[in-house]
A protein has these predicted regions:
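Glycine-rich, aromatic-bearing surface loops/beta-hairpins
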Residues: 117-163
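A general secondary-structure signal for short beta-strands and their flanking turns/coil
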Residues: 29, 81-85, 140-142
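Short flanking/linker segments adjacent to small metal-binding domains or redox-active Cys/His motifs
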Residues: 73-126
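N-terminal interaction modules that seed assembly of large macromolecular complexes
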Residues: 16-59
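Short Fe-S-cluster ligation motifs
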Residues: 62-78
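Short secondary-structure junctions and interdomain/linker hinges
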Residues: 58-65, 95
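Short, charged low-complexity linear segments at domain edges
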Residues: 1-22
Length: 163
């Protein structure tokens, strides 16, 4: 299925992507029980419907992301900013990210076309992928995700975390 964004397009085999996630036993934070991973899992249901629909339309289960890390926080809003990596079975059609920047993953954010799902979630796609499960079907397209997630584990996260 062709997805057109502001200045680039991707072609995603949504059903193969969805099938992979449905059959995978991997979970986000597999083997990790830290409070930040617990918060992401617990906060998923409170994410904006538009964000959940975006991932679902691509066939991606964000709770099975290859990586999801809290990078910084906004104490006034009780929000954590997570960066993550998800994989899709697909390819770039035009507006290739790689034409715009040859820098490593997160450094590329400032130099590449991005798509804002909404004010709380931005993504970009690349064929320069990492952390792909061996069983993931080709062709692999990596989606880098930056997402605001509320602290939902009670109280303020500043009472729990030391940044």
């Amino acid at each position: 299925m062709l997805f057109r964004f502001d200045n680039f397009s991707i072609d995603v085999d949504v059903e193969r992507t969805r099938k992979y996630y449905a059959e995978s036993s991997r979970t986000l934070t597999e083997g990790c029980d830290c409070i930040l991973c617990q918060n992401f899992r617990a906060a998923y249901e409170s994410l904006d419907t538009e964000i959940k629909r975006f991932f679902d339309n691509l066939g991606v289960d964000i709770l099975q992301a290859a990586d999801m890390t809290a990078m910084h926080a906004d104490a006034k809003r009780n929000i954590l900013y997570y960066d993550g990596v998800c994989h899709l079975c697909g390819s770039m059609v035009d507006g290739s990210i790689e034409k715009h920047c040859d820098q490593p993953l997160r450094k590329a954010w400032h130099h590449t076309p991005q798509y804002a799902v909404n004010a709380a979630c931005t993504v970009y796609f690349t064929t320069n992928y990492a952390m792909v499960e061996k069983s993931f079907p080709d062709p692999v397209l990596q989606m880098e995700v930056a997402i605001e997630v509320p602290w939902v584990l009670g109280g303020k996260f500043t009472d729990t975390l030391q940044w």
